[in-house]
Amino acid sequence: MLLTIDCGNTRTKWGLFNADGTLLENGACLNTAITQAKLPVASRIIISNVAGLHIRNQLESILPNKKISIYWITAQAEECGVKNGYDKVEKLGTDRWAALIAAWNIKQAPCVVVNAGTAVTIDALNETGEFIGGMILPGIHLMQQNLGLVTAQLPTITSEKSVSAADNHYQDIFAKNTADAMHAGAIYAACGAVMQMHAALAIQCKKTPYILISGGNAQLIKDNLLGDVTNQALIVDNLVLRGLYLIENFAP
């Protein structure tokens, strides 16, 4: 069994895969509670960590002491059919790298790869499997919260309120109260960035790319895209974990 672990900015996610790539079980916890996590037993472990050394140290304290294979990944120049076009390949976030590998494995075609969590990453894969660049912006909740913190008359919207406001996923762009206007602004900033990347990649590749979306706000972004681009968008759960499975099993 292979245990895949994705230490993100706010939460740590994990998934247990069997040899044929079936996800048998998965879970998550806040990084602040990582030492209480009950991880499943596995013979191999592969980890992506973008949460820093403190979280790595805490995670290591609960990993099995017995001699099993534990691999902390770094982005490579080329792996699993994906070429890394970053200026310094090792500086690409390991979560982005794993998600790109999973996306290429799924489509093997031009893709916009979106991971929507505390931050939103929007990355471009061309028709040959080369990562040609991407962008990072604040997550939807983070945009709303920070706007309230630095303005005099706008409310500070907590994560709880933000999630509640988004329960139906669709947000009217013509908002008629301040809280909804802030919510709409954050959502459509993220969606607009996704749509711009999709348009730019279509021009670059001379064909229509797919959009693969993962992360806690994946549904919120997908449901608020506009126009024909919606036909190319799909949600893929656990994209980073699936990429980690591929790296462990198919990378040289």
Regions found by a protein language model. Give the residues of each.
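Nucleotide/phosphate-binding catalytic cleft detector across ATP-hydrolyzing
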Residues: 1-11, 15, 23-111, 128-252
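Short beta-strand-to-turn element immediately C-terminal to the catalytic PLP-Schiff-base lysine
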Residues: 17, 123-126
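Divalent metal-binding pocket/active-site signature
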Residues: 114
